[in-house]
């Protein structure tokens, strides 16, 4: 079936546009020009653009620059886009003009078409929907708004959920002692609660870092217009816009104290991405620890048993793999890679404008979404559900030669080292060898070498 087209005009001439498309000429030019990938701009970014258009229309109406009926129609159309009703009308590739002008015009055109249909007369993409704005302040603002909304409403709650799940598991395993490991080698004992507490602290610190990095993200570029001077925008626009946007999005924003900073650089986003990378590093460490602890079940550490979620091999029957920790490590790797892309893109601010904004938006929002989902998966399908293999823990503790460290203050380092070597070579319990090699009675040795007491620190007496 042959597709029908209509002719649209812009400042460069005529363009064939699909007859049923809500967008107009400039969006079609971008669709024709940019066929570099299968990635379109993230839905969260499109929603942020619509929030911006909605808040801008309200602001311009309040300032007396835009007729109330047109402003309301723009606001209604913007809300429909926010609600995801027209996702297919935003087809532009991520790899497009570096300012993101194509995506700004895509939003302007779709919203103008919808508003025109509501009113029965033409609403202009440029003169009405884009009033008092430039792509150069809209796109940086859309990055900031989409990131702030999704971090506050999605990622931070996910990190809190993971932290609480770790806390619950700490309580459940508070008295369970295991062999500690440094350099992947046997070390002094720790409790599961101590080990999980370290993980929880990583997650809590990551959440704090992300929260702190949100402060400059919430200081918006909107109002700087083309180069940061605010040309063609009412001097009151930025403050009222930020207030309106805060009410619409339920996230508190304010105007930047220096629009030149927000347009010419993406330093605040680079900083935020660095904090997302820190969270990814924490998840990578936790996931890999879980994989090691679950290794076996017979020829590995076998300290825990992760929930079996799916068959692990197409050739080896009965094999079950730690699929959730593995998936989380891949998420972490992707987020770390995204941070590198954002860092390079952040360097691309030439004079008054950064020109890698779309790829920054794509990678930043992907990182936020991936981390959100990974936190939930790790919490619900790994941390909350793993079981401890107490028999393996007790066997490893009994033969751990490093327990002799507790005897250092009593018999000296060299004597303790001899006992540790003999116990290891003979595969015997450190308690039995120490009883033979020292003049300490067994009751004293049992007290000194009690693994639970050794998790509490201090000096043996």
Q: What is the meaning of each model-derived region?
A:
Residues 1-461:
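Conserved, well-structured ligand/cofactor-binding cores
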């Amino acid at each position: 079936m042959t597709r029908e087209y209509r002719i649209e005009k812009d400042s460069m001439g005529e363009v064939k546009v699909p007859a049923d498309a809500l967008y107009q000429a400039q969006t079609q030019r971008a669709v024709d020009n940019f066929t570099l990938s299968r990635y379109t701009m993230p839905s969260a970014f499109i929603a942020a653009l619509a929030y911006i258009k909605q808040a801008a229309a309200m602001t311009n109406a309040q300032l007396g620059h835009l007729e109330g009926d047109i402003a309301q129609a723009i606001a209604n159309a913007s809300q429909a886009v926010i609600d995801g009703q027209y996702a297919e009308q935003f087809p532009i590739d991520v790899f497009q003009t570096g300012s993101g002008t194509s995506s700004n015009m895509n939003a302007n055109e779709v919203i103008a078409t919808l508003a025109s249909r509501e009113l029965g007369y033409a609403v202009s993409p440029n003169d009405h929907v884009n009033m008092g704005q430039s792509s150069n302040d809209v796109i940086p603002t859309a990055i900031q708004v989409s990131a702030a909304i999704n971090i506050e409403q999605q990622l931070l709650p996910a990190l809190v959920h993971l932290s609480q799940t770790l806390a619950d598991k700490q309580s459940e395993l508070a008295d369970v002692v295991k062999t500690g490991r440094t350099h992947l080698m046997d070390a002094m004992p720790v409790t599961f609660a101590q080990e999980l507490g370290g993980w929880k602290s990583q997650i809590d610190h990551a959440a704090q870092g992300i929260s702190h990095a949100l402060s400059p993200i919430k200081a918006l570029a909107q109002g700087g217009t083309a180069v940061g001077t605010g040309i063609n925008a009412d001097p009151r626009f930025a403050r009222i816009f930020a207030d309106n946007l805060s009410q619409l999005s339920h996230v508190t924003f304010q105007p930047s104290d220096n629009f030149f900073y927000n347009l010419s650089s993406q330093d605040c986003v680079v900083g935020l991405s660095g904090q997302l990378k820190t969270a990814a590093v924490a998840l990578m460490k936790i996931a890999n620890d879980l994989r090691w602890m679950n290794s076996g079940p017979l020829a590995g550490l076998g300290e825990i048993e992760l929930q079996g979620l799916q068959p692990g091999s197409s050739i080896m029957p009965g094999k079950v793999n730690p699929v959730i920790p593995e998936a989380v490590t891949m998420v972490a790797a992707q987020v770390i890679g995204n941070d590198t892309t954002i860092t390079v893109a952040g360097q691309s601010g030439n004079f008054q404008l950064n020109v890698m904004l779309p790829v920054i938006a794509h990678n930043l929002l992907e990182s936020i979404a991936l981390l959100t989902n990974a936190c939930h998966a790790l919490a619900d399908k790994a941390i909350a559900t793993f079981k401890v293999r107490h028999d393996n823990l007790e066997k490893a503790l009994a033969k751990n030669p490093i327990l002799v460290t507790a005897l250092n203050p009593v018999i000296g380092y060299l004597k303790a080292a001899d006992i540790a070597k003999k116990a290891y070579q003979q595969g015997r319990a450190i308690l039995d060898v120490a009883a033979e090699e020292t003049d300490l009675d067994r009751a004293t040795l049992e007290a000194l070498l009690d693994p639970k007491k050794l998790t509490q620190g201090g000096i043996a007496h």
